[in-house]
Amino acid sequence: MAAQSGRVTQVIGAVVDVQFEGHLPAILNSLETKNGGNRLVLEVAQHLGESTVRTIAMDTTEGLVRGQEVTDTGSPIRVPVGEGTLGRIINVIGEPIDEAGPVKSEGLRAIHQEAPTYTDQSTEAEILVTGIKVVDLLAPYAKGGKIGLFGGAGVGKTVLIQELINNVAKAHGGYSVFAGVGERTREGNDLYHEFIESKVNADPHNPDPSVKSKCALVFGQMNEPPGARARVALTGLTIAEDFRDKGQDVLFFVDNIFRFTQAGSEVSALLGRIPSAVGYQPTLATDMGALQERITTTQKGSITSVQAIYVPADDLTDPAPATSFAHLDATTTLSRSIAEKGIYPAVDPLDSTSRMLSPLVVGEEHYAVARQVQQVLQRYKALQDIIAILGMDELSEEDKLTVARARKVERFMSQPFHVAEIFTGSPGKFVDLADTIKGFKGLVEGKYDHLPEAAFYMVGTIEEAVEKGKKLAAEAA
């Protein structure tokens, strides 16, 4: 059957209406036209009446004119997959945007796929060690699970994601896919160059045969129209699914999943849907479910996904972050009040949760230490009002000791990052799980009550804290 062609009848920002004679293209099909010499891809979103489809443009529509010819490709948007994508930057429609020539792909795959069936899914529970103390102890990540990083603007979500890529890619050596959804282009550019410098990826312009690229980058950043931002997460996921189906354990990073929802909401109004709570699209839960249900572990391989989730105005009850919560195995909440104390990563130890923190998965000792740490911090939180009104002197001896230990625990949760070496000047630390448990266990049992608080700030293992304590004592003397 020859490719169907139609004509543009109306352009409203990112939404384009196309009229076809006879057979209408299916919903989610991709249509193509030329705009200023460039290929413009439109995705069918609605059928209007007998002969018109309403589509969402994947690029800017400036310069489109009514009557212009549009061709139906007969399938959804298809993107290159396989090892040829590693080390490359591609956009939502699979075109390379790193000026390093065409992508050597092993074939094309449609970005809209069915989620794996129940029978295909794997149910094993295994922990993914990240080398970040506060995460591994209190909200451990599941291998093949979904992890959400919640936080307002500027509390360190992107830095934490970069550290995870660095630690986990180096520790387990698998492939990663990074989807930049509606975030700053500058950060995407920095990430690309950091990957080349840290040898996670080879430089496509200047290949070094000793470096094998481990991460594919897919970007649809803030300057892109909403169509691209609403679909780029699916493009990244399609590449990750292909690696998984070939038996790989893949890491899939999305920065930022809120922008995926935001783009959907921008398009929704243009498509004429009546908005729901807080102006979001009525299909919010469906859109989120369609993406999240595909991120799963099958009998063949696993996808472990880490998603940064921007929280508008620090309000966790906003429909966008609240809808994401339902899908996650672990949540890491970054708190502004902790960042203000200078404690980085600014992970809130009482607000971060994980399905994996169970004695059956992590073992009795780990579970007991994690609960003791949370107990000490919870008690400290309860005493803060009394301290603010009456001061430390009014507390009982037992409470004074609890406060002192809690402050040390808080500081011991900070840790120098490899990716932050550039601006902190201190070398990054990867802390093994056994060392993390040992350190916090000693702290809550009172083994280190004699050391000053400052000894625990920005160190890796407890041995480093003891060394730092000795140094501080020598300097004070």
UniProtKB/Swiss-Prot annotation:
Superkingdom of this protein's organism: Bacteria
Gene3D superfamilies (alphabetical): 2.40.10.170, Bovine Mitochondrial F1-atpase, Atp Synthase Beta Chain, Chain D, domain 3 (1.10.1140.10), P-loop containing nucleotide triphosphate hydrolases (3.40.50.300)
Keyword check for Membrane: yes
Keywords assigned: ATP synthesis, ATP-binding, Cell inner membrane, Cell membrane, CF(1), Hydrogen ion transport, Ion transport, Membrane, Nucleotide-binding, Translocase, Transport
GO MF term set: ATP binding; ATP hydrolysis activity; proton-transporting ATP synthase activity, rotational mechanism
SMART domains tied to this protein: AAA
List of residues binding ATP: 151-158
Subunit and partners: F-type ATPases have 2 components, CF(1) - the catalytic core - and CF(0) - the membrane proton channel. CF(1) has five subunits: alpha(3), beta(3), gamma(1), delta(1), epsilon(1). CF(0) has three main subunits: a(1), b(2) and c(9-12). The alpha and beta chains form an alternating ring which encloses part of the gamma chain. CF(1) is attached to CF(0) by a central stalk formed by the gamma and epsilon chains, while a peripheral stalk is formed by the delta and b chains.
Protein name: ATP synthase subunit beta
Provenance organism: Bradyrhizobium diazoefficiens (strain JCM 10833 / BCRC 13528 / IAM 13628 / NBRC 14792 / USDA 110)
Organism lineage string: Bacteria, Pseudomonadati, Pseudomonadota, Alphaproteobacteria, Hyphomicrobiales
